[in-house]
Amino acid sequence: IIECFFSCEIEKDGKSKEGKPCKPKGDKDKDKKCGGWRCKIKMCIKI
């Protein structure tokens, strides 16, 4: 079994309301000015 750890950050956009991060809800959403999650694999270990 291989277990991986992720390091996630919230991408913030200057145009978002009050500087709060938010996620796009769908393709039909007209307001896509907010940031989203950006994840990177930190490390993987074998158990």
UniProtKB/Swiss-Prot annotation:
Its main location: secreted. Disulfide bonds join 4-34, 8-39, 22-44. Contains 3 disulfide bonds. Signal peptide: none annotated. GO terms for cellular component: extracellular region. Expressed by the venom gland. The keyword Lipid biosynthesis does not apply. InterPro entries: Hwtx-2-like. Pfam families: Toxin_20 (PF08089). One of its GO terms (biological process) is regulation of membrane depolarization. GO terms for molecular function: sodium channel regulator activity; toxin activity. Keywords: Disulfide bond, Ion channel impairing toxin, Neurotoxin, Secreted, Toxin, Voltage-gated sodium channel impairing toxin. SUPFAM superfamilies: omega toxin-like (SSF57059). It is found in: Secreted. It comes from the Eukaryota. Is toxic to insects. Reduces amplitude and frequency of spontaneous firing and inhibits voltage-gated sodium current (Nav) in the dorsal unpaired median (DUM) neurons of P.americana. Belongs to the neurotoxin 12 (Hwtx-2) family. 01 (Ap1a) subfamily. This is Mu-theraphotoxin-An1a. The lineage of its organism: Eukaryota, Metazoa, Ecdysozoa, Arthropoda, Chelicerata.
